[in-house]
Structure formats: structure tokens, C-alpha cells
Amino acid sequence: MPFALGQRWISDTESELGLGTVVQVEGRMVTVLFPATGENRMFSRAEAPLTRVIYNPGDSVESHEGWSLAVSELTEKDGIVIYHGIHSETGEQVTLRETLLNHNIRFNKPQDRLFAGQIDRLDRFGVRYQCQMLRHKLASSDLLGLQGPRVGLIPHQMWIAHEVGRRYAPRVLLADEVGLGKTIEAGLIIHQQLLTGRAERILIIVPDTLRHQWLVEMLRRFNLRFSVFDEDRCVEAYADHDNPFYTEQLVICSLELLRKKKRLDQALDADWDLLVVDEAHHLEWTEEAPSRAYQVVEALSEVIPGVLLLTATPDQLGHESHFARLRLLDPDRFYDYDAFLAEEDSYKDVAIAAEALAGNAKLPDAAINSLTELLGEKDISPSIRLIQAEGIDAEVQQAARSELLQELLDRHGTGRVLYRNSRASVKGFPKRFFNAYPHAMPDQYQTAARVSGMMGGHKSLEAKAAQALSPEKLYQEFEDNSASWWKFDPRVDWLIEFLKSHRSKKVLIIASQAETALSLEEALRTREGIQATVFHEGMSIIERDKAGAYFAQEEGGAQALICSEIGSEGRNFQFASHLVLFDLPLNPDLLEQRIGRLDRIGQKNDIQIHLPYLEDTAQERLMKWYHQGLNAFELTCPSGHVLYSEFAEDLLNVLVVDDSDELTNLLNHTQSRYKELKHTMEQGRDKLLEINSHGGEKAMAIVQRLAQNDGDTHLIGSVIRLWDIIGVDQEDKGENSIILRPSEHMMFPTYPGLPEDGVTVTFDRDTALSRDDIALITQEHPLVQTGLDLITGSETGTTSVAILKNKALPAGTLFLELIYMADASAPKSSQLYRYLPPTPIRVLLDKNGNDLSAKVDYASFDKQLSAVNRHIGGKLVTASQPILHPLFAKGEEYAQVVVDEMVAQAREKMTQQLSAELSRLESLKAVNPNIREEELEYLRNQMQELNTYLDASQLQLDAIRMVLVSHV
């Protein structure tokens, strides 16, 4: 295409960007700026999805200054069109270079296509209209961002995501207990922030071992393609940009990478919108000597507007550590540790009042006094009288309790900054049962251990303990590859018998090392032909998906999945309830992570944990410490990290040297400290915080709405028709799933996001949750969004001609169906779509210009129509032109009335909602310092911006259908 600087083009795929200007032509690329949204797009000159905008004599064009020009002629100079005509305000003869056209101009292209005989198939018009309706429905939903992720509809998770994800630059601490889904909550918030335009650039910082887990979670659950950055990736990225972090929008990296000053400086300069830090409780801090890791996150949190910290429960690592994390979120608010402790003491009165309100009994005097003092600026006596009165309707009393609870939540505690759910407050978890199976130590292992003892004097205590826990690895090191430990290890014999006696059960087996997992698979296959598959860190994501799918398959699938420690990260298998621990990890957190593969919300059965171990070895001693000291097999142990830190040296000594007295002493001390920590945590429970974190009835209402949307058969039918029109091959696979593949006859050359070898999808959430290799299709899924964009961003379905066979009407009767879009060009981040979403406006005119759309609905009218071929349709349009021209003007009049009303309603809704929220936050700021000034300033600016965008809203003709009555 011939491009020149200053020319005006419109994007065929993103028409909402408005009129674009060519700002750079270099080599094979052209860059177009879209001033209406402030966005740049770079295209290949040869294949740019752009249409040149040139007006004709008779057209009216608008300058960027607001005045119009009635075009009489046009000339061209250096590739730039110059329009000549009459100035609308002065009446003078003037010229206007195309570069100075108003960038908010919209184009009624369907009219031009109709009169040029470019007529689409009838079904494409219908699909286009449905696509616009789907876009409107999605944009106007207050649950935008929650429907699409492949996650269970868990109330507390959806509540936190709904509350936090809607905020501008949220800065919160997610501190749920293990197994309650902090990663999912963070993913939901990220998904919402991206989909709503509140964030575009996101940096996730995780420990080295969790980078892959986050990559998998973000892709498989949220359809978000993050890039993992390490030193090698940074070096490679220099070819594209001086700052490697600018080469991707969504980045995962480790703290280790950012410890390097050069990389940290680059990250600080990369203009992120949201920072997410996992395992934030490992950021060590003291007032005198904060750790390097803490300083890295602190520096980033000072320049990045939004911050999510994922951490262990606040009680787990002590108050000072908890304060340090809150300080990262708001250093002005949490500036002094002593002041923080004093404030925490005052929360006890709040907790007492909250506990009383959350119950059903009458309020004790102490609670009433606390409430009166805490809510001093509000007269609460009417609510108190309702709660205390006899014979009052239970719903009325509950409403009064809820109102006072909400007042407490708004005004006290860290509810806007901290979310923490515990298993005590969230129901739905299975029970855990521990089964241990002792076996004698084989002679071969004893010999290998003796030889190693003579040779390994230089090894560290931890290395010796790890060696003692994995005798099979030690044996294999001393023997050549022809020796196979699994031929004599009694644990393998037990495993084979166990699987044979539980043939109908799915069994997850976890071992520390990938080599162990591979050997076990070989043993099961060669000795008994048991169907098992492996899952380890040496496999690609696709290979792991296939292994997981093979295991999940009910018929013909693997009975057992054998995972390595690292390989199992980020994968959950709730459909299985038997877990075999072939060995034990040294760290209690890793043990909980193993059990957590099955022990999640959504697990429908009790979990049976099986441990085959070698008697009188380090394996037995570690098992006793976990079971008798921490009760870590049958209950989650939030204090496991603290206990391991305190007793690590004693534990390692006991594992390396068999001393029964030392073991007994260690178990007694561990039990005592475990009970002490458990009691402290129970005492420290903040009832108000728990109520705010799990959301109660409001959370249930959100989940019910999402569940209703899941069963929307209209959506399923619309999406299937969309894929049919585009030409995507669809093969029914059974199990509520279909395979989508690109075909040779697709309407578009490519379908972004649809792999060449296809993808298996389902509309059923339960099916998607049980199968990692099946994508969950909702209106938010990229394959649906891309399909909608392909249709609505192209000319597909913009014109159509149809026949209405109805003898009750005279033959030749003409109807003109016009679909307009009420829209305004605005950046996603403005949130304009919440008040004025892209809205299709249907006008159905008879030949006299009467609008029949209120009397004749779209669906019933569409069913009566028959298609005509393009050639005949063109002739019918040509013959009807004298009637059609005045009807277009009439249709625009009707649609403009609707748009004006919609804009007025949008302005009223926006002003009402934002003013109310601003007023609420301003009044709360006086009593709750957790309200940030940045949030208030954002709301004030947003109101001004939205009014400007609403003023610029316009009407755009999107599609035309001409209908003629025939009796033939």
C-alpha cells in the first residue's frame, strides 16, 4: 500500500480507535497513531488491515477545531488529500488538509457498500448483530473479568477478586491460609484489571522454583500469556530494546534476577501498572537492617501504582514481619511499628463487636458500648433497638446486623488493605486420613549407606539428611546403570499391590526426584503392566498437559500419575483422593504443597494419604516428626515454616544419627511449641477481617450469578454460529467437548489464538476443571473475543438483502433494517464502557419512514426471511435507491434520539455512582486512614474525563438489511 506521513486511515479490526494518522513509514513497516485513544499501532505495509479515508464531493467533513467543510472538490499533494469547500461557520471558501481532520469522525461505510453492490450473505448479517449484542452484554456486566477464568466458583475467591479487581491501582495483602487459593485470587484480580483496562503492564515476582507454576497457572486458568524473564532472556531482548522489560507487557521473573542493580534499575524504569509478589512473607525486614530482597520490592512498590502481596497468614511469622509487608503497601499509613501495635490492640474492641453482630443472639452490653463508641459519628440506636427487640421479623433483624457490620468494616481495621481467609471460616474442605506402611531396610541399601558413611565425611548436615531420606538414589550412585533399585525395594512391591487392589481408583504418587518418578513408572509397566504416566520438570508444558489429561481420563486413562516434587507444582488433581508419598520432603511447606495437589476447595472425597517407609531409618524419624510433632498429614500446619526454622538443626541431627532419646526429646519440644503457636493463632483471629474476607451472602450472590451465566444456552448457540460463519472446523469429541481447528476455507487468513493443530474446548466448567487440556469457553475467552473482533472489526455482515414471504403484505413492500452503534472513542482505562457500553440500536423502517422496531422484534422477523443471491440483491438495491436515500436520514434521526437519551442516562449514572463513592470515601477517610488519597484523586479525574468522552460520543451505522416482500 502507498503510505505517506499525515495520511488518515482507519483500522479494519479496531474501528473503535477512531481516525488514525500515519506518523512513521520505515522499511516494510508503517506506524499509525490513533489520537482519540492515544494508542499507536505498527503494521506490515504489505498486509496492513487499514482502509484509506478519502471523502467525495458532497460529503461533509469536520476539522479537529470543530468546524465543518462541505466538500466541493479535492486535490492531492505529496500523497496528502486536500479538501476544498465552504466553511460551515463563515461561509468562506477554504481548504482543509486531511491531516487536520477530526480524529473522532465515524464512517457510515455500510451505505457505500450497499449501493456498490457489495452485499453479504443473510446469515452473516445475523451473526454480526449477535456479535454486537454479545459485546454489549460483556462490557456492561459488573462481573467483567470473573466469568472467563477456568476456576471453580468459590465464594470467598470471587468476593475478593470482585472487591479488589474493580479498584484503581489496588494495593492489598492476600493472606489466605494454604489451600484457599491465593494464586487464583491474584489471577482473577490480574484478569479483571487487564480486561477492564485498569492495567496493561504487569510484573510478577516469584521464587525461582515457582516461576513455571505461575506461568502454567496464568496460561491454563486465565488465558494470559506471560513471559518468564531470566538473565539469558534479558540479554536476548537487547536486540529489540535497550530495556529488556519493555519487550513484553506481562512478565514473570525471580527475585534473584532483580537483586542485580542493573536489572532492578531497568525494572524500575519499565512503567508497570501492577506488581504481584508471591511468597512475600520471605521478605525479611527489621527497622535497622532490611534484607536486599525487601529493598528490591520496596523500591518497585514506590514507583508501581498497584501492588498485590501474596503471603502466609499474618500470624504465621509474627507481627513485625506482618507490619513490614503492610509498610510496602502504604508507608505513609504504616510508618511506625509501635504505633501499629497500639492500633492493633484497639482492634480487639472491634472484634468483640463484630463477633456479637455476626451471631444471632442479643447483643451484650459490652458489645453495645463498643459499637456506640466505635461508630460515634452515627446514630445507631434504631438499629440496636431492632436487634434487641422481641418478635421482630428475622430478616429485618439480620438486615440491621448487616448494616452495622458494614459500618464497622468501612471504618475500622485493615479491611481494604488485608484479606485473610482461614479454613475455620471457609467451609467445604475434605478430611485427611494418614496411613503408614513400614518395611524392612534392604541389605543393598544398608551396604550403600555404610560405604557412603566412610566416604562422605565432608558433606553438610543437610546433604547427609537428604541422602539418608533417599537410599535408592544413593544406591544408584554406587552401582552402574544396569542396576535397578526398584527390583528389590519393598516400597515398590507394596505400591504394585496397592494399585492392584485399588484398580478403580485414581492414585497420585509423588517422589522428590524426577529420576525416581521415571524408575517407578518403569517398574509398574514392566512388572505388572499397570497404566501409569509421569510428570516431571524435564517435560514441556504440552507434554505435562497430555500426561495430566491421560490421568484425568475416566475410561482408558492412566490409573496412576507419578510426579516429581518440582514437576507437580501448579497442578491440582481434585478428581483423585488417594495420595502416595513415596518419600518425604524435608520442608513442611513442601509436604503441605504435595497434599495440596488433592486437598483443595472442590475436592469431593476425603483424602487418603499413604506413606510406605523403611523402618528404623531417617524416613521413619521424619514421618514421626511430621505426624506426632506437627500433625501435618491430617491437618494443615500454618506454623510449619516457623517450627522448621526453630527445630531444623535438631531435626537434621536426629535424621542423620539414630538416637531414640534425642528423637523423643525433639518430638516433645515440637508438640509443646506447636500447641503454643496454635493457641496464639486462634486467639489472634480477627472476626471482622474474616467477615470482610469471605464476603458472606454478597459472595454467594456473585457466585449464583456466575453459575447462571455458565448455563446460558443462547451464548453457546451464538458462539457456535460465530465459528460456523468464520469457517472454523468443529468436531464433537464427546465428554461435553469439541475440537476446533482452522480450515482452508476460513473467512479470514488467520484466527489469532487458534493453534494449527487445533484445541479442545468445552462450555461446561466442571469438565474444564477436571481436564487441563480442555479450554473453558465463556464470553471472556480469547477465542470468543477474537471471533467477535474479527466479525465486528471487518465488513462482514454490514450489508444484506432478504425476501419476506408474507401474503398478508403487498408484494414489493420494502423494509429497511438499520443497526447503529452508540459508541465513544476512549481508552479502556477510562472505564467509559461501564456507563456507555458499545450498544447496538435497531431501527426497522417501512417505506414511509415509520419505525416498527418496537412492534416487530428481531428474532421473529429474522425467522421469516429468505436469502437472495448477491447479483439479484444488487439489482433490487439499485431499483430501490430513490426510496432508500430518505430512509437513511430518517433512520439516523430515530437512532440519534435513542443515543442522546443513552448518553444522558450514562452521564447521570456515572455522576451518581462516582459522586456517591467519592463522598463515601471522603467521609471514611476521616475515620479510616486506609483510604488512600490516590483513590480519591483518581475518582475526581475520572469524572472529568468521562464527561469529556461522553460529549464526544457519536452514532455509527454498523449494518443494513433491506427486505422486500415477495409472494413467489
Swiss-Prot record:
Chain positions recorded as ATP binding sites: 176-183
Domain Helicase C-terminal: from-to ranges: 491-641
Single GO MF descriptor: ATP binding
SMART domains in the cross-refs: DEXDc, HELICc
Gene3D superfamilies reported in the protein's UniProt record: 2.30.30.140, 2.30.30.930, 3.30.360.80, 6.10.140.1500, 6.10.140.2230, P-loop containing nucleotide triphosphate hydrolases, Tandem AAA-ATPase domain
GO biological process: regulation of DNA-templated transcription
InterPro entries per the UniProt record, alphabetical: Helicase_ATP-bd (IPR014001), Helicase_C-like (IPR001650), Helicase_RapA (IPR023949), P-loop_NTPase (IPR027417), RapA_C (IPR022737), SNF2-like_sf (IPR038718), SNF2/RAD54-like_C (IPR049730), SNF2_N (IPR000330)
Motif (DEAH box): 278-281
Pfam family, one: SNF2-rel_dom
EC numbers, comma separated: 3.6.4.-
Subunit structure: Interacts with the RNAP. Has a higher affinity for the core RNAP than for the holoenzyme. Its ATPase activity is stimulated by binding to RNAP.
PANTHER family xrefs: DNA ANNEALING HELICASE AND ENDONUCLEASE ZRANB3 FAMILY MEMBER, SWI_SNF-RELATED MATRIX-ASSOCIATED ACTIN-DEPENDENT REGULATOR OF CHROMATIN SUBFAMILY A-LIKE PROTEIN 1
Homology family: Belongs to the SNF2/RAD54 helicase family. RapA subfamily.
Function (record text): Transcription regulator that activates transcription by stimulating RNA polymerase (RNAP) recycling in case of stress conditions such as supercoiled DNA or high salt concentrations. Probably acts by releasing the RNAP, when it is trapped or immobilized on tightly supercoiled DNA. Does not activate transcription on linear DNA. Probably not involved in DNA repair.
HAMAP family assigned to the protein according to its UniProt record, in alphabetical order: Helicase_RapA
Protein name: RNA polymerase-associated protein RapA
Source species of the chain: Shewanella baltica (strain OS185)
Lineage: Bacteria, Pseudomonadati, Pseudomonadota, Gammaproteobacteria, Alteromonadales
